[in-house]
């Protein structure tokens, strides 16, 4: 498998899987379903702080899964599901109102907050289903948010107490205990609604600055929901039951047939942060899949990850969006699970020391930059000044090979690829004076 960041290799690799489906070339589209991201990967993509915002986003994902579960059921015109949906939301709204009534002291503060909550809850219901019973229920709450000379005379409290007698608490708790586990499908279209519901709960608990604390994260969420760059995460040709199914269907990893032994992902049009997330998530899935193998299976059907322009993924001294760079982990531990890393870069001095320290073999093409030459000289054993001269003087197609794969350093002529990659240099002088 290769994470290729440009389209120059289309000719030799016609079975590539780019993330986009509108290239005009006979590609198969690449998808990375958002619901296969784990919590840490979501937090990294949203640039959320691990301590403060992790519990918030976990609640959002859990609420999204609940919304999807009960609303998906309601769409089937199942009266039982519809009752569960209405019962749960009434219970949830009453819980938020009760929090406000218990947290605040004056009737003016209580009623002002409750009126605002009712308005936002109405927006949530309208976004979900426009259920008439729930809309009427919220309207009745709003109608009891009146003040006479600054007093509500317990009108709202009496109404909520009365309504609680009509709520099936056990059924509501049953839905509340529905938990999202990694790999379960949920519809991303419920994310914004779930965010608003969790924000309302946090504000009702007295966390008045929760919207301020989550503003950056929610801006990134809007980017995911609306930007074409994330379309390959939102849209997919099929639902995948789990990571293993995804790897088998998308990359034929774990499949019995051997028809797709080399797969190229064209990631040339995604931004740096999305690129890092995309490659990290796919590599993490493959790592976890290989790690689950036991006995002889662990040594069968090995997987090689080829990283072209590797300085985009494994930069030296870089702040990765994910706390632990998966490629460094694969470099350290992948051998035990028959998962191997092939790193290609024109700037070796920019690569992670951790990854390079685990590399057993090196193929060095022509290098002119002194910084890169010194770096190669420092990391390679048995590397002498003579080899530096050979590297400087080498012509396209020549390379020096070092490492465990050869008994001694070798200078070789690489066989020319047929067909050639689409990477020939432009003849500038000829193009300048070309007659139209």
Predicted stretch roles:
Residues 127, 131-134, 140, 396-436:
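Conserved P-loop NTPase motor module
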Residues 6-10, 262-264, 362:
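Conserved beta-strand scaffold positions in the cores of enzyme catalytic domains, especially
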Residues 1-21, 32, 353, 401, ...:
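Glycine-rich phosphate-binding loop of nucleotide-binding enzymes
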Residues 2-5, 257-260, 299-301, 336-338, ...:
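Short, well-ordered loop/turn elements at secondary-structure boundaries
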Residues 11, 266-269, 307-309, 401-405, ...:
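Flexible glycine-/small-residue-rich
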Residues 48, 322-323, 329-415:
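Conserved ATP-driven motor cores of ASCE-family P-loop NTPases powering translocation/secretion/packaging/pilus
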Residues 1, 14-326:
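P-loop NTPase motor domains
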Residues 280-283, 360, 416-418:
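Short, solvent-exposed amphipathic alpha-helical segments in soluble enzyme
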């Amino acid at each position: 498998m290769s994470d290729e960041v440009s389209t120059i290799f289309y000719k030799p690799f016609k079975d590539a899987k780019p993330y986009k489906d509108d290239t005009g070339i006979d590609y198969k589209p690449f998808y990375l379903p958002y619901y296969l991201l784990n919590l840490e990967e979501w937090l990294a993509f949203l640039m959320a702080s691990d301590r403060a915002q992790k519990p918030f986003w976990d609640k959002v994902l859990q609420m999204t899964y609940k919304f999807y579960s009960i609303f998906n059921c309601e769409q089937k015109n199942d009266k039982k599901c519809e009752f569960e949906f209405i019962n749960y939301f009434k219970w949830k709204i009453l819980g938020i109102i009760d929090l406000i009534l218990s947290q605040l002291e004056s009737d003016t503060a209580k009623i002002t907050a409750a009126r605002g909550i009712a308005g936002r809850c109405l927006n949530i219901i309208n976004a979900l289903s426009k259920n008439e019973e729930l809309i009427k229920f919220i309207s009745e709450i709003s109608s009891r948010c009146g003040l006479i000379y600054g007093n509500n005379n317990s009108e709202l409290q009496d109404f909520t107490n009365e309504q609680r007698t009509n709520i099936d608490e056990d059924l509501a708790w049953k839905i509340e205990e529905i938990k999202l586990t990694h790999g379960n499908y949920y519809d991303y279209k419920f994310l914004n609604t779930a965010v608003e519901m969790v924000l309302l709960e946090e504000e009702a608990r007295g966390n008045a600055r929760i919207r301020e604390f989550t503003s950056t994260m929610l801006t990134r969420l809007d980017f995911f929901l609306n930007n074409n760059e994330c379309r390959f995460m939102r849209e997919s040709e099929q639902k995948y039951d789990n990571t293993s199914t995804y790897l088998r269907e998308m990359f034929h990893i774990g499949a019995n047939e051997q028809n797709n032994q080399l797969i190229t992902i064209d990631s040339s049009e995604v931004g740096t942060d999305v690129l890092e997330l995309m490659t990290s998530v796919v590599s993490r899935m493959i790592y976890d899949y290989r790690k689950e193998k036991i006995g002889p299976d662990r040594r069968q059907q090995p997987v090689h990850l080829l990283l072209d322009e590797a300085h985009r993924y494994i930069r030296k001294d870089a702040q990765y969006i994910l706390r632990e760079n998966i490629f460094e982990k694969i470099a350290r531990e992948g051998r035990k699970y028959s998962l191997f890393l092939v790193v290609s870069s024109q700037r070796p001095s920019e690569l992670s020391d951790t990854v390079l320290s685990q590399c057993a073999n090196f193929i060095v093409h022509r290098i002119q930059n002194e910084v890169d030459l010194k770096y190669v000289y420092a990391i390679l054993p048995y590397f002498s000044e003579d080899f530096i001269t050979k590297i400087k003087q080498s012509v396209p197609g020549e390379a020096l090979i070092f490492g465990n794969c050869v008994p001694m350093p070798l200078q070789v002529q690489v066989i020319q690829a047929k067909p050639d990659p689409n990477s020939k240099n432009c003849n500038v002088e000829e193009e300048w004076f070309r007659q139209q």
